[in-house]
Amino acid sequence: MTITRKSHPLMKMVNHAFIDLPAPSNISSWWNFGSLLGLCLMIQIASGLFLAMHYTSDTLTAFSSVAHICRDVNYGWLIRYIHANGASLFFVCLYLHIGRGIYYGSYMYKETWNIGIILLFLTMATGFMGYVLPWGQMSFWGATVITNLLSAIPYVGTNLVEWIWGGFSVDKATLTRFFAFHFILPFIIAAMAMVHLLFLHETGSNNPLGIPSDSDKIPFHPYYTTKDLLGVFILLALFLTFVLFFPDLLGDPDNYSPANPLNTPPHIKPEWYFLFAYAILRSIPNKLGGVIALVLSILVLALFPLLHTANQRSMMFRPISQILFWTLVSDLMILTWIGGQPVEPPFIIIGQIASILYFSIILVLMPMAGFIENKLMKW
């Protein structure tokens, strides 16, 4: 008689994905972030659902409905701050997950990598629309500025912006549709994450050495379920500490003022996790050029499999590539800092240099480093 988990149609799928899945014996804690992202998504969907029960997507009542959640709903303040800071946690895990993929050459699984890029775009869209919903000053002006960028598209730009707005400015129609999209997108993300996992399990996981691990596999359960669980507890401990002690640290004070179309905030900026892309956008004086650079800053990830010149998959034994990788990480931190600064010297030139360096490292220096390392290996 076969074990139920191996024969039952539903349990069989779970079994193949999380229990009897053959996994490399040497994957490090950097491989924990996939499961942590799944946890983040579940936290966001659950907290978001409870917020949606009390939120109203109307320009007159949106701001006060968020205040009502925080003041009058049982543990509403906690749900609200879990959801707001959960977005930051999501992006921290997301960027670490992508960084791991770049460092260890996981992008060579092209289907998994490309679906990951689509997931990144979907998550960024969800995060942006969620930021608009509280209808504070930064919500309103952030929505106005970012959606208005589409007007840079030749010929159809203006019509496209008015179509997205549902009028001639960001108003009730915009807020209502943003709420609708913000509600549905996480479920699309969840479905895409399953496809992401499906393609990953076609090839099996990569490992820190970047070499085939078919000869040395271990079952996912109990080894990696336990390991992932440790990551979950550490993550939740850090997250709850942040939510309960520093809930407003990453928010913008301007968002505690209701949206006012007649009063522009001195510095319009998105949430911290978009600042690197915002800095790249601002570093180009031309509007259309900035929009193209903004999209390319994320889309450039799709070129990683094509630009891989090294004979070794992982960067573990490639010191030149390692230096470039950590330079890229530092460069992204500089871009994040610049994105939050006003457009004035010396921030303008720093942003422009950092933007050029970002694309140079990925498109030119990393492929060159791989080529040089191949030559050095032959000595």
From Swiss-Prot:
Q: Which UniProt keywords apply?
A: Electron transport, Heme, Iron, Membrane, Metal-binding, Mitochondrion, Mitochondrion inner membrane, Respiratory chain, Transmembrane, Transmembrane helix, Transport, Ubiquinone
Gene3D superfamilies in UniProt: Cytochrome Bc1 Complex, Chain C
Q: How does it sit in the membrane?
A: Multi-pass membrane protein
Respond yes or no to whether keyword NAD is given for this record.
no
State whether it acts alone or in a complex, and with which partners, per the record.
The cytochrome bc1 complex contains 11 subunits: 3 respiratory subunits (MT-CYB, CYC1 and UQCRFS1), 2 core proteins (UQCRC1 and UQCRC2) and 6 low-molecular weight proteins (UQCRH/QCR6, UQCRB/QCR7, UQCRQ/QCR8, UQCR10/QCR9, UQCR11/QCR10 and a cleavage product of UQCRFS1). This cytochrome bc1 complex then forms a dimer.
The gene for this chain is MT-CYB
Which ranges does the record mark as transmembrane?
A: 33-53, 77-98, 113-133, 178-198, 226-246, 288-308, 320-340, 347-367
* Annotated binding of heme b b566, by residue: 97, 196
Residues given in the record as heme b b562 binding sites: 83, 182
Task: Identify the cofactor(s).
Answer: heme b
Q: Name one GO biological process term.
A: mitochondrial electron transport, ubiquinol to cytochrome c
- What does the entry's cofactor note say about binding and number? Binds 2 heme b groups non-covalently.
Q: Where in the cell is it found?
A: Mitochondrion inner membrane
What is the protein name given in its UniProt record? Cytochrome b
GO cellular component term, pick one:
respiratory chain complex III
Binding locations of a ubiquinone: 201
Source species, domain of life: Eukaryota
Q: Name one GO molecular function term.
A: ubiquinol-cytochrome-c reductase activity
Protein family (similarity comment): Belongs to the cytochrome b family.
The protein's job, in short, is: Component of the ubiquinol-cytochrome c reductase complex (complex III or cytochrome b-c1 complex) that is part of the mitochondrial respiratory chain. The b-c1 complex mediates electron transfer from ubiquinol to cytochrome c. Contributes to the generation of a proton gradient across the mitochondrial membrane that is then used for ATP synthesis.
Remarks, miscellaneous = Heme 1 (or BL or b562) is low-potential and absorbs at about 562 nm, and heme 2 (or BH or b566) is high-potential and absorbs at about 566 nm.
What the entry lists under InterPro entries is as follows: Cyt_b/b6_C (IPR005798), Cyt_b/b6_C_sf (IPR036150), Cyt_b/b6_N (IPR005797), Cytb/b6-like_sf (IPR027387), Cytochrome_b (IPR030689), Cytochrome_b_C_euk/bac (IPR048260), Cytochrome_b_N_euk/bac (IPR048259), Di-haem_cyt_TM (IPR016174)
Instruction: Please name the Pfam families in this protein's record.
Output: Cytochrom_B_C, Cytochrome_B
